[in-house]
Amino acid sequence: MAEETAEKPVVESFQLDHTKVKAPYVRYIDTETGPHGDVISNYDLRLTQPNKQAIPTGGLHTIEHTIAVLLRERIPGYIDCSPFGCRTGFHLLTWGTHPTEEVAKALKESLEFIAYKATWDDVPATTEKSCGNYRDHSLFTAKEWAKQILEEGISSDPFERKVV
């Protein structure tokens, strides 16, 4: 293997002290400005306490598909919301920047819908044609986790509980 001389890129989420955060929360991570001045913001939507809990893949997958629609309806400039590999939450990308309180309220409303109103018909893209792992969904698990997250309250700050 050739000797590496270039510095390795810094991955922000690997710099976060996961022992200090208090989930569930919304955390503003960073903003990037593109070559044409377009601004994209990245948020950490942490649903469970790192290294203490992880949402099973079927439930997380169903939450992912459902909030793809629900957050898009609630957050102007929504681009994407993708799950963390550790299964404790999601990265949310938006055009422009939104206060964490606004994002936390949108997340709360979305989880309330999942927990108390959603039916299988509300979960989009659950067929072999529309999903890369369509058999790995669980609305029951998504509902149970959404209820638990809502009971704990979603904070607009990762280190100090400021529940919205």
Swiss-Prot record:
- Give the residues the record marks as binding Fe cation: H61, H65, C131
What's the Enzyme Commission number for this chain?
4.4.1.21
Cofactor: how bound: Binds 1 Fe cation per subunit.
Q: Which InterPro entries does the record cross-reference, listed alphabetically? A: LuxS_sf, Metalloenz_LuxS/M16, S-ribosylhomocysteinase
The entry lists its GO molecular-function terms as: iron ion binding; S-ribosylhomocysteine lyase activity
| Metal-binding recorded as keyword | yes
The cofactor(s) it depends on are:
Fe cation
**Catalytic activity, reaction form:** S-(5-deoxy-D-ribos-5-yl)-L-homocysteine = (S)-4,5-dihydroxypentane-2,3-dione + L-homocysteine
| Key words of the record | Autoinducer synthesis, Iron, Lyase, Metal-binding, Quorum sensing
Pfam families for this protein: LuxS
The answer to keyword Magnesium applying to this record is no
GO terms in the biological process aspect are: quorum sensing
- Family membership: Belongs to the LuxS family.
Instruction: Enumerate the HAMAP family for this protein.
Output: LuxS
- How is this protein organized at the quaternary level? Homodimer.
Record function comment: Involved in the synthesis of autoinducer 2 (AI-2) which is secreted by bacteria and is used to communicate both the cell density and the metabolic potential of the environment. The regulation of gene expression in response to changes in cell density is called quorum sensing. Catalyzes the transformation of S-ribosylhomocysteine (RHC) to homocysteine (HC) and 4,5-dihydroxy-2,3-pentadione (DPD).
* Protein name per UniProt: S-ribosylhomocysteine lyase
Organism from which the protein derives: Bifidobacterium longum (strain DJO10A)
Please spell out the taxonomic lineage of the organism that makes this protein.
Bacteria, Bacillati, Actinomycetota, Actinomycetes, Bifidobacteriales
Name the gene.
luxS
